[in-house]
Structures are given as structure tokens and as C-alpha cells.
Amino acid sequence: MYNQKSSMTVRYEINPPKISDDGQDVRNVLFERIETISSVCNGIHLTDSVLGIPRVSPFEIAKQIRESDKNIKLTCSLRVRDKNLNDIEKIVEQSVGTVDGILVLMGDKSDAMSSKVELIPSQVVKTLNDNGLGK
């Protein structure tokens, strides 16, 4: 048997607000949803620009959640499509102690972003692990 424990973290996925919609009212609604959700599950996963639509950073939202809730499990998606390796390493370094895990993925193409050299997600994971950031 893989896991002897009888429990696991059940996470609820939340999309941060679109950058074009971002404002205090939208964030208030988001945090009301998060508060409601956190009472019925023990983890939240924050997405990163689903369908290539620019959104507020999931890591920014995670930091705000962590300020008010020290116990909830937080994970974030991290798109590599529109970032360079230095930016990714900086995001991961700044997230230590805030998020419990990061899902590295290619991400959907964005009409708003110009095509950059595309990183390969598995290579990004290897680099993060080799640099001690995946422990």
C-alpha cells in the first residue's frame, strides 16, 4: 500500500482576479469566497493565468491568505511560458514559508504576451531541485 495514512489534503482551486478586473471590490469577493471555502476544506490551490488570461499573481494572493490563515494548505500553479528562469527562481525563493507546494506547468498561450523562448517545465523543476528550492 502506498500511503498508510487514512487522510489527505482536499484542495479547492481558485482563479485570482483578472488583472483587467482587479480592484478592491473584486478582491473582497475573492477573500470572502476563500474564507467560506477554508471552512469546508483544508487546502486551496491558486491558478496562474488560466487560458493565458493575465491575472493577479497567485503568489501575491497566497501571501495575503497566509497573513490571515496560518493553517490552511496553499499551493500555486507557476506558468513557465511567460517567465525566465531567474524570475521563476525569485518567485520560488520568495514563496518559501508562504506556500506548501508549487505546480510547475507550461501554461496556456496568451494573446497579451509576446512569445518568449519557452522553458520546458521538467527542466525548470530539475533546476529548482538542483538549486535546493524543491526540498
Residue ranges and their predicted role:
Residues 2-135:
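Active-site beta->alpha loop and helix N-cap motifs at the rims of alpha/beta catalytic domains
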